């Protein structure tokens, strides 16, 4: 691996190089000018850079990065400096590239529900711009009024509403970025779906180590018709935690569940006069959102749970002003603790929700042992703790003792099966602990990926990874044995041994997508169907782990017994699809409409790389921002980067009943107009499918008591139509996800699209006899193609679209355009340098 190099340019030569790009007022070198950039929000770390540059255009950023690469000059990209992990701390031998002046919203498309923004745009400004269209940007970190989208992307920021809506990575559809060597890449696009590895999701949370995002395409969501918010005061923290457990056990999925302890409440009152109940040891905030007809009865159930949980005071927000008052203290919690202590460290760990009580008791014990006050604020719904460790840095040894206490809390999170960070990232603060959460092999593989994109580690050097010493290359390819019968490993170790033993392998799961597992005459088939079984299922945590060869149908059956399901609606379950094959192909179904696709529910993976090493990524908790997002990298990777062996997913409570409205519109234009109206509506829809020219299926899910009223409201918008219920309704969607509508012998192709592209695509397809179905309100086309594939290739190339062949003849699985090939090839070199797995 290439060694790190430090620039030899030095400060005297900086003006001549950077001065050709920047005028003096945007090229800062004086000590007083550099002072504001010496730290971010974690002020215990400070460093003075050689210079700060303030670009105003993408071209200036690109030119600066290319200069840094040429001169081996380390650089750090910075937004508003709100990082709480030291993630934007300068490098003393490098420069800071300040991105606040790249602050334009380049496009806001209410029909497609996207915004294209520059990295310096403030988080809250996106929602403000989208508000006239009844849309908003869901991730809501506490610093959303000042933090930038570029920083949110770098650290995969979250917020109070992550349990329902997910984190930044779940809301970024596309990225234009400059890599550390100055190469420009475009990842993803405008569709909710994609072909190939989820490089967009993988880029998010890379903490600036993969270069600088220049443009970010964000997914906007309709503002809920109603919010119902309450706060409940408790005499003990344990009682508040028990209330959370009861809420989850009841199958209620709030938009947010937050808890603040006595010290945090004291700080909030001192700073913002939130008016919270007096004498509370803990305050619980719960918020439901959605259609009024659905939320109101669920909120009544929530109130009964809270009333029975021992709360001594309950307040229900009566209007938006009340709601804002409830959230005011919580949003200002971090900044408020300055009223209690001159200095503080904010921790950011995650534990399984069922172990919150154990974690809080341990924090209390450590606080007493160290005689250091700790205020607790946390996202109780996803187990994300934010202990605020209060100290006075002027006291000798106080900082060191506070850091020691913080470290013990981090290690506790690991010990309890959680993560060392849920949303703040590793940065400088937690570098030493990453190697305690992941083993040496995991770390080496992440570093190989990093160096495949940045050989000299120039981009945000010293962040995320501790010093690792030499990272060896993967082992060499062995002599080629004769190709034998199909291998069928039953254990992970057998998979590792198989990879080490053969120079060329192709993975196969249940055989439901045969075009993706064709092997050349020189490749060994690795059949994973016997690597099967659910390893761990915790209904109370909304998580399970299964081996890659486990049948989707088996998982669905196990989940249904607990009233839970896979919201991304994996396809081909009735034809033997496996969990590993579903992830490798990246195939979500019609039901992804409401809560998202595979990328929104895959939490962790283990895979075998080209050297036969077992590599882990992600975690077994619903919130995690530690290390590179290897789970997203493996989605759609088609076995090109490694052999998946086990996977951890998030699940949700399953709607108790469904109803589908089936309509026939007179033409395509009318059907698309209806789709557009649905996309901008506040309906919580499980699925929206279109079969051209005008047949629509719109699925609702929820409680039996409210479905009838919701169906009436839907009919008021779309027209009467036919209502399908019970077995007839279930069979309709089972046939859709198993592609029973596809004629025998047809090639099955997945094509990511957008609503705006459908008319152009239909101009071509309507001239050809082919069955097809648009899913997810026009974001995904499933095409049963009976003509020559060369003709489809030409159509896709003309329209700038890409397709994935799942079944049918063809030289390869890809059709039309592909993005991210350069990036994928570099990453493949890091994970499979000997080329054991198929090329991408």
Predicted features and spans:
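Conserved glycine-rich FAD pyrophosphate-binding loop
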Residues: 2-9, 22-24, 31, 39-51, ...
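Generic secondary-structure signature for well-ordered alpha-helical cores
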Residues: 16-24, 70-73, 128-135, 158, ...
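Short, well-ordered beta-strand elements within core beta-sheets of diverse protein domains
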Residues: 51-56, 219, 228-235, 287-288, ...
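Short, acidic (Asp/Glu-rich) active-site segment that either coordinates a divalent metal cofactor
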Residues: 85, 96-99, 209-215, 288-305, ...
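A conserved active-site cap/scaffold subdomain adjacent to cofactor or substrate pockets
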Residues: 279-303, 674-723
């Amino acid at each position: 691996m290439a060694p790190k190099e430090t620039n030899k340019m030095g400060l005297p030569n900086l003006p001549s190089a950077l001065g050709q790009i920047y005028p003096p007022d945007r090229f800062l070198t004086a000590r007083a000018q550099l002072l504001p950039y010496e730290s971010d929000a974690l002020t215990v770390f400070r460093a003075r850079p050689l210079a700060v540059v303030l670009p105003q255009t993408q071209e200036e950023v690109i030119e600066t990065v290319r200069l840094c690469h040429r001169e081996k000059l380390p650089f750090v990209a910075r937004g508003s400096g709100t990082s709480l992990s030291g993630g934007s701390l300068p490098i003393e031998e490098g420069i800071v590239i300040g991105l606040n002046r790249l602050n334009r919203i380049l496009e806001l498309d209410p029909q497609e529900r996207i915004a294209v923004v520059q990295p310096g745009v403030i988080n809250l400004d996106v929602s403000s711009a989208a508000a006239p269209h009844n849309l908003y940007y869901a991730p809501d970190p506490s610093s959303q009024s000042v933090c930038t989208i570029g920083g949110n992307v770098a650290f995969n920021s979250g917020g109070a509403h992550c349990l329902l809506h997910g984190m930044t990575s779940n809301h970024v559809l596309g990225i234009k970025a400059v890599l550390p060597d100055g190469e420009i890449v475009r990842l993803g696009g405008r569709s909710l779906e994609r072909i190939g590895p989820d490089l967009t999701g993988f880029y998010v949370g890379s903490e600036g180590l993969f270069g600088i995002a220049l443009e970010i395409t964000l997914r906007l969501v309709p503002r809920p018709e109603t919010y119902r918010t309450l706060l409940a005061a408790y005499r003990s923290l344990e009682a508040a935690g028990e209330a959370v457990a009861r809420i989850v056990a009841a199958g209620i999925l709030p938009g947010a569940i937050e808890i603040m302890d006595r010290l945090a409440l004291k700080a909030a009152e001192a700073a913002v006069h939130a008016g919270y109940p007096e004498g509370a040891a803990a305050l619980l905030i719960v918020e439901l959102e959605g259609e009024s007809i659905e939320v109101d009865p669920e909120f009544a159930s929530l109130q009964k749970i809270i009333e029975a949980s021992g709360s001594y005071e309950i307040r229900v927000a009566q209007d938006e002003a009340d709601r804002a008052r409830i959230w005011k203290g919580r949003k200002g919690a971090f900044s408020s603790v300055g009223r209690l202590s001159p200095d503080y460290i904010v921790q950011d760990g995650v534990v399984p929700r069922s172990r919150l009580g154990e974690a809080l008791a341990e924090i209390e014990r450590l606080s007493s042992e160290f005689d250091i006050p700790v205020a607790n604020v946390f996202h109780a719904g996803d187990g994300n703790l934010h202990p605020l460790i209060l100290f006075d840095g002027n006291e000798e040894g106080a900082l060191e003792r506070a850091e020691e206490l913080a470290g013990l809390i981090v290690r506790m999170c690991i010990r309890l099966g959680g993560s060392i960070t849920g949303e703040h990232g590793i940065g400088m603060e937690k570098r030493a602990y990453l190697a305690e959460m992941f083993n040496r092999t995991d770390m080496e593989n992440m570093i190989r990926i990093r160096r495949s994109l940045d050989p000299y580690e120039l981009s945000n050097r010293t962040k995320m990874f501790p010093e690792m010493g030499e990272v060896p290359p993967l082992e060499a390819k062995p002599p080629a044995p004769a190709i034998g019968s199909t291998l069928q490993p039953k254990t992970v170790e057998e998979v590792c041994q198989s990879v080490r033993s053969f120079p060329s392998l192709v993975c196969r799961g249940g055989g439901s997508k045969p075009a993706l597992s064709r092997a050349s005459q020189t490749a060994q088939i690795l059949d994973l169907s016997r690597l099967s079984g659910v390893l761990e299922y915790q209904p109370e945590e909304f998580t399970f782990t299964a081996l890659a060869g486990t049948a989707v149908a088996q998982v669905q059956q196990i989940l249904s017994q607990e009233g839970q399901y896979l919201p991304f609606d994996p396809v081909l379950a009735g034809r033997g699809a496996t969990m590993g094959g579903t992830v490798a192909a990246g195939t979500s179904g019609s039901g992804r409409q409401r809560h998202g696709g595979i990328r929104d529910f895959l939490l962790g993976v283990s895979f075998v790389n080209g050297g036969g090493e077992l590599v882990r990524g992600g975690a077994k908790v619903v919130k995690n921002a530690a290390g590179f997002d290897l789970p997203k990298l493996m989605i759609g990777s088609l076995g090109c980067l490694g052999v998946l062996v086990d996977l951890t997913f998030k699940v949700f409570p399953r709607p108790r009943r469904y109803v589908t409205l089936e309509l026939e519109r007179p033409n395509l234009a009318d059907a698309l107009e209806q789709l557009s109206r649905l996309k901008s509506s506040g309906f919580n829809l499980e699925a929206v499918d279109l079969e051209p020219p005008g047949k629509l299926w719109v699925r609702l899910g929820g409680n039996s008591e409210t479905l009838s009223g919701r169906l009436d409201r839907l009919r008021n918008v779309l027209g009467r139509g036919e209502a399908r219920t019970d077995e007839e309704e279930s069979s309709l969607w089972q046939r859709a996800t198993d592609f029973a509508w596809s004629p025998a012998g047809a090639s099955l192709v997945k094509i990511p699209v957008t609503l705006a592209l459908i008319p152009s695509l239909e101009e071509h397809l309507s001239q050809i006899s082919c069955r097809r179905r648009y899913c997810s309100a026009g974001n995904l086309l499933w095409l049963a193609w009976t003509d020559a594939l060369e003709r489809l290739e030409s159509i896709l190339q003309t329209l700038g679209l890409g397709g994935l062949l799942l079944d049918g003849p063809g030289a390869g699985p890809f059709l039309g355009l592909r993005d991210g090939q350069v990036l994928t090839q570099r990453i493949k070199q890091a994970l499979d340098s000997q080329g054991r797995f198929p090329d991408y």
